[in-house]
C-alpha cells in the first residue's frame, strides 16, 4: 500500500491543501535502489560469427607484425625490445610477433576487484558485472536556473556531490565538468582533492605525464591511509589511455600508464578512431586497426 495516499487530515482540510502538501519535495520522493553492482543475465550479442572474429584478429596480428605501432617513449621501446620485439634505433615503430602478443595478453586478468578508500564501494571489473559513471570532461555545464556556462570548480564540486549521492553511479570516471577557472598546472591537485573529500567511490586519474600521475597516486594512497607497499597490493584507482591513431601511442599517456601499471593500478586502453579520417573507411578495417593499437599497449603494460 502506498502510504503517501493516506491522510490524517480532518474534514476541514481542502483537496487543494492536500495536493500542495503531497507535491512538496521530501527525501522519500527521491528514493532509489540500494547500492549494488548489476550483473548481465543475458549473453552479449555477437556482432560476428567465429570466422568473422578470426578474420579481424588475423588482420590485427598482420598489422602488428608487418606494419607496426609507433611508441613515442624511449623506455617503452626498450622494454619491448628486451621482450623480443623488432625495434630500430632510427624509428619509433615497433613490430611484434603474434606469439608474444597472445602470450602477454593472456596474462591480463579476466576479473579485477577495485578497492577505493571506502571498501563498501568495492567494484568488480570483468565477467558479467556492469559499472556506470558520470560523463567526463565536458567543457560546459547547464541547469534550469542559470543556463549554459563554462565549467568551473563550484559546478564541478556540485556534480561530484551528485555522483556520490546516486547509487546508480558506481565510480568517478573523470571530471564531471572541466573546471577551467583552475590553472592547468595545478588543476589535477584541486580536482583530486575534491574527488577524495566529496566522494568515497573509486576515482580516475588522467594519464598525462609524470607529475599528474604521481600526484594522483600519492593522494589516493594518503586518502586511504596506506603506505606505498599497501597501495600497490591491490588496484585502488584507474586511468584510461587513448592511442593517437593511426597506429601511434604518444609519450604523456604511455608514461602515465606505465607508472600506474608498475604500482598494480588499472589501466584501460581505449583506441579512439574516426573511420575515414584516422582509420580505414570500412568498419572491418577500422576495428582491425583499433584492435592492433589496443593489443600493442596491453602487451607493453603486461611486460
Regions found by a protein language model. Give the residues of each.
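Acidic/polar, glycine-rich intrinsically disordered N-terminal extensions of enzymes
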Residues: 1-155
